[in-house]
């Protein structure tokens, strides 16, 4: 067969195979055209699930008479005119294929009138060459598109259509998504002459929760946490459901928008899932309605024919930005009291009322005095190797979906850790223990283990969510896992033989501070640098550029102001005291597994060998079995 140019109708039908998947696809394309035309009211009429009729009427700008024929032609659009326009597209449509494709697989009529025209005009295309016919019509300012008998001339496509109910369900879902994208537009949806949905426009700054509740349901609205997050050209707003209240039905609500365009993006979903993974069940998914605003030059929407996907030029930056925004609001909501065996500090927190993070961040407000934010834990709770497995290994294990919720039980990783626990080589403790803080001074010391001991012992099981049962030399002991984790965090923060490894922040955190706070930070800057916290003072602002690994995933907009308050109350605090304070804020109360307990103990023994010989108070509690044995022998 020789190479030849395809007839216009056949070419349009091929394009329709990519754009027009089902009636819902037609509704999406036509409603997006109405929104691009500036419509504030859109009426959608559906008959027989869209197979018989799809009618979209809007009050937008309309189309001039001499442009109607072009509107039905391929690759004709008013949205872009050059490559520069394509690379910075802000309209929903831009391909110029939708109307031509739809008209090739249906009987489409386009009726429109602009404000400066006295009469309306109607256009339709027919025949092999898709010739456009234009005739006068009666119509108000705006546009009406009628799509009759969808797929009437492509039987193969028509037989793949589902039942009327199923097709309308897909249309309803598309309309729901569009209604969530444009709160300022009234949208009405009817099916077979019956009004099914009425979404009234939200005027100005009026609350949007009413429409949100009508679309997502009262259950989502009850657990929804508002997000307002901004950095430079990136802005994130919307709602995410509190993980504890997320059910299987609620998890079906996953709507994300990029510059107002509804999107299915794996990067965005992964960032949100990662932010919620510690608080969700193993089979749970987060529920959210989120809007991402980004510089149009930094995102490519010309990826998918139906414009369902985008490609970010700086995907890692976008991922971390969304992750930090979601983590921030979850931590703000899930603030828990200190889960330690020692009382919290009595000194009141030093918090000015005018602290605002850069970008009008709403989550820089101080937490209540008796509570601190529950923060993501970067400790090496999960390990795929021996005792030297660091927090990076823990994080990668946590991200695979199974480890965060592992149930107690013997595994290969546990066996390797058991072996390493019992074969830890002798280490000569340093003359000054860097992990000793004032907390140890006020707590009675636990009984010292044997001088030749270099291991806390073997983890047998968990007797509660955060208490492990240990065995060594035939003796049993209870271990407070939260206390062990706190000392481990403190040891990771303190400088040792080499300078602490400061991790540069992808998005530096900039906070506004008062004159007194500037003096405090100036005085503490050398200490913070030794702990791996790099700050830059500039007038009445402080910028955090790098933090040590344990602080990498923390909400610094909350943590740093609280740290300033602590330094104001404790001006003579040394490195160990500051590290101890930070460690208390890194510990989060949550159930442990045996594998987590083994990994934490192994790392603690490696970093703090002196604790094995002289455990601090509150860490270990020996169990005396002799009375029970005497009772059994009736002695």
From Swiss-Prot:
Name the CDD domains on file. Answer: HATPase_MutL-MLH-PMS-like, MutL_Trans_MutL
Task: Give me the segments passing through the membrane.
Answer: none
Q: Which UniProt keywords apply?
A: DNA damage, DNA repair
Q: Spell out the Pfam families in the cross-references.
A: DNA_mis_repair (PF01119), HATPase_c_3 (PF13589), MutL_C (PF08676)
Could you name the domain of life of the organism this protein comes from?
Answer: Bacteria
Q: Name one GO biological process term.
A: mismatch repair
Q: Which PROSITE patterns match?
A: DNA_MISMATCH_REPAIR_1 (PS00058)
The answer, when asked if Iron is one of the entry's keywords, is no
User: Region (Disordered) spans which residues?
Assistant: 359-410
Biased-composition ranges, Basic and acidic residues, are: 367-379
A GO molecular function assigned to this protein is: ATP-dependent DNA damage sensor activity
Composition-biased stretches, type Low complexity, lie in: 383-402
Tell me the Gene3D superfamilies matching this sequence.
3.30.230.10, Histidine kinase-like ATPase, C-terminal domain (3.30.565.10), MutL, C-terminal domain, dimerisation subdomain (3.30.1540.20), MutL, C-terminal domain, regulatory subdomain (3.30.1370.100)
Q: Family assignment? A: Belongs to the DNA mismatch repair MutL/HexB family.
Q: What is this protein called?
A: DNA mismatch repair protein MutL
- Specify the taxonomic lineage: Bacteria, Pseudomonadati, Pseudomonadota, Gammaproteobacteria, Enterobacterales
